[in-house]
């Protein structure tokens, strides 16, 4: 039996990592299948090394196409080494970001084109898509303010981009979720975290009742 693939998307500072941790703290013991938690870029030894290159603020001369290809390379390794084996074992895979982030950040934010970046990632992943995607919706100004308060002076290369870039990324996410309305669930990430977590859990119970 194939497992389930659930991704969490959103602008920087939306709280994806925190929400995912809180959700699994609450429902992890109740889940029937085993589950795996992973992230992008990264998720495997090789992919984590590529992550370091992508996000290092010292690499400020990185070309947009290079950036997109590095994300796709990390994702290809991640999928083949971690995600596909877990799904084939019937596990639930929860991923902090997946292809949709590249469509928003590189496709729209870097002006490479959503369709063009999708083609690169279709090749990298063998056209693997999540079964369910949570989009944590927050204005980029608010998200970046959260990061600056949480990690002052420690922003990564993409977090350090100007607000115009982050607004384009946000608009990219809006376009992407409209392309895949069947799997996207939008949640207001400006709510208290308990409310966000409860809405995620309620959606999982409704959309994937067989995992409980």
Swiss-Prot record:
Gene3D superfamilies reported in the protein's UniProt record: P-loop containing nucleotide triphosphate hydrolases
Gene Ontology biological process terms, A to Z: dTDP biosynthetic process; dTTP biosynthetic process; dUDP biosynthetic process
InterPro entries in alphabetical order: P-loop_NTPase, Thymidylate_kin-like_dom, Thymidylate_kinase
Catalyzed reactions per annotation: dTMP + ATP = dTDP + ADP
One GO MF term: dTMP kinase activity
E.C. code: 2.7.4.9
Alphabetic keyword roster: ATP-binding, Kinase, Nucleotide biosynthesis, Nucleotide-binding, Transferase
Residues at which ATP binds: 10-17
GO CC annotation terms, alphabetical: cytosol
CDD domains in UniProt: TMPK
Similarity field: Belongs to the thymidylate kinase family.
Summary of the function given for this chain in its UniProt record: Phosphorylation of dTMP to form dTDP in both de novo and salvage pathways of dTTP synthesis.
UniProt protein name: Thymidylate kinase
Phylogenetic lineage: Bacteria, Bacillati, Bacillota, Bacilli, Lactobacillales
């Amino acid at each position: 039996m194939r497992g389930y693939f659930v991704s969490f998307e959103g602008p920087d500072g939306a709280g994806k990592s925190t929400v995912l941790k809180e959700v699994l703290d609450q429902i992890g013991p109740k889940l029937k299948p085993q589950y795996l938690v992973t992230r992008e870029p990264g998720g495997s030894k090789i992919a984590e090394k590529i992550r370091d290159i992508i996000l290092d603020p010292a690499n400020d001369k990185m070309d947009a196409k290079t950036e997109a290809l590095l994300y796709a390379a990390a994702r290809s390794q991640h999928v083949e080494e971690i995600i596909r084996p877990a799904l084939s074992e019937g596990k639930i895979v929860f991923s902090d970001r997946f292809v949709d982030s590249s469509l928003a950040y590189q496709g729209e934010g870097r002006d490479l084109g959503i369709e063009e970046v999708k083609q690169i990632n279709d090749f990298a992943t063998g056209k693997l898509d999540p079964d369910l995607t949570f989009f944590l919706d927050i204005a980029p100004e608010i998200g970046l303010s959260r990061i600056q308060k949480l990690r002052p002076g420690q922003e990564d290369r993409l977090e350090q981009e100007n607000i115009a870039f982050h607004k384009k990324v946000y608009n990219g996410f809006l376009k992407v979720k409209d392309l895949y309305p069947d799997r996207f669930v939008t949640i207001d990430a400006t709510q208290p975290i308990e409310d966000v977590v409860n809405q995620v859990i309620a959606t999982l119970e409704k959309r994937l009742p067989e995992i409980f």
